Amino acid sequence: MKAVHTESELMEKLKEELEDELEGIIEYDHLYNALKAHKMHKEAMVIESIASNEYKHACALWDMLKDLDVDLSDHEDIHTKWETVKTIFNI
């Protein structure tokens, strides 16, 4: 991991981490649906549990960034992925 030297770099790194978490959840959802389609229900439940934990991580990062007053309004990818994740979890 590249060393972070400034507060600005740190905030960018946190945004990247949030986006990575959201992408991971979306990928887990695709895997979950594929497993269910193949009647692999036990395996799908494991993936659902992992995705749920990833969602908790994403929420923690989201809240942290909001508490730090980081402006996410110019990060359309994050907002789009966040809306997708909320749909996945029926929020």
Label each residue range with its predicted role.
Residues M1-I91:
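Non-heme di-metal
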